[in-house]
Amino acid sequence: MSPAAPVLAVDIGGTKVDAAVVTADGEVLRASVARRPTGRDTPREGIAANIRAAAVEALTAVPDVRVAAIGVGSAGPVDLPARSVSPLNLPQAAGLPIDEVLGGLVDGPISLALDGTCIALAEHWRGALVGAENAMAIVVSTGVGGGLILGGRPISGASGNAGHLGQTFVRTIDGDGVGDAVAATLEAVAAGPGSVAWARTQGWVGETGLDLAASYRAGDEVAVAAVRRSATAVGQAIAAAATLCDLEAVAIAGGFSHVADDYVARVAAAAAAASVHAYARRCRVVPSGLDGDGPLLGAAALALRT
């Protein structure tokens, strides 16, 4: 990143929107951090108002800081040509025009990207992917997202949704026989809600990802199987991505990636087992090098590239 003025970073998610002012060297100004709710049932006008309110709060908290640009990372899908977002968990916000929502707040450009692209940018800037020219970041949480860095640059694709790995299909074994193989999206199989739902069909009586983590630590057989099932699916998807894109490294982030201490190791083993070619097996699978500020750092990195 070249020297530049601070930027406003905005991260739009399915339950909340975060905003903060971030310096050119990656310092999130703590006084500026702001959060507002979004939510599936929130009206479109309310979502737009809360996005803008979070941005305004962040800016007004540091009135002496000159902000040069805005970077926005959003849950997908996004539409970069239309400059709009349509987060799957915010049906009321389909086609929300970002320039209208955030226009006029700063005297500078507004950059938009998929949240997965922003996470990849953040990992490449200050996290686990520093120095990797061809890499991917994957977030395993209530959903599964991802972003790509190829040739040292973020890849957006035609609409802005390159790297949206969660909606690709994987083949997972739910039992011991070939007849138990099913095809499903990576997100349905590997994300926290899907893993919890599957465990409950197997007789597990917990309710949340935190419950599943506790059961895993206690050695509960179903919880162990659910974690293994999730990690195997993520590993299969990584093997496909590494084969297609010749990746050097993949960073795993997201709350559900902490469901077990050995989750990333399980993903790495599954990726190696599913890779046909040696070059794909050489792809390193590593934990995220970021803290909870990762999405904001990614949105800031996006703005700083402008």
Annotate each language-model stretch with its function.
Residues 28, 84-85, 154-155:
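Hydrophobic "anchor" residues
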Residues 76-78, 89, 116, 141, ...:
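Short, flexible active-site-adjacent loop segments at beta-strand->alpha-helix junctions, enriched
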Residues 83-95:
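A charged helix-plus-loop insertion that forms the helical arch/lid used to bind
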Residues 1-69, 78-82, 100-110, 122-132, ...:
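ATP-binding/phosphotransfer module of carbohydrate and carboxylate kinases, centering on a glycine-rich
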Residues 11, 69-75, 113, 137-143, ...:
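Short beta-strand segments
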Residues 89-91, 111-117, 137-140, 286-293:
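Active-site nucleophile and cofactor-binding loops and adjacent substrate-binding regions
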Residues 33-35, 89-90, 159-160, 170:
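Short clusters of small/polar residues that mark proteolytic maturation junctions
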Residues 132-189:
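Glycine-rich phosphate-binding loop of actin/hexokinase-like ATP-binding domains
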